[in-house]
């Protein structure tokens, strides 16, 4: 029984919050994904953290997002790879918050139309992929690959990182980890382990990643500190 209700006080019921994420493949990997995002949210000082729903493929993630949106009893966001660099007209710029629905609406393989009632901020990108986020934090890479990382093989961790293609990122990672004990980057084995160590302040330098953290409610003092 709610004591506040007995005293005549208004009862505030907080909506459930869901983040539908592209990724995962099996129960163990799904658990790693949820843990990595929860750690990222904690480090970013996000108080009201959404529950992470691991949706595997991007099409399933979009469908899950639409279904939760239709139910109307929760706050929901969709986080997917942009897969490709975002066109200039849809990019984040001064005076323009970016147009993610235009990107997936015209992208071959998606052709997603913005669902009724969905806002621009409910669609978030790992631009162009999760590997962008991983490469942004050299220290996180070192914690997983331990030694032998060739940082000079990796692209600059600044804003231009979000303009690199998936092929560029994969090639750079392959070259950078060649002399580590793992010898190669394996998305299933490594990606969420690295993400668990990624610093929100490093992500804050990337416009689309910063947009995501801001929408999730990141604390400014946690993400804007120099590193």
Identify the function of each model-found stretch:
Residues 1-227:
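Acidic, divalent-metal-binding catalytic cores of TOPRIM
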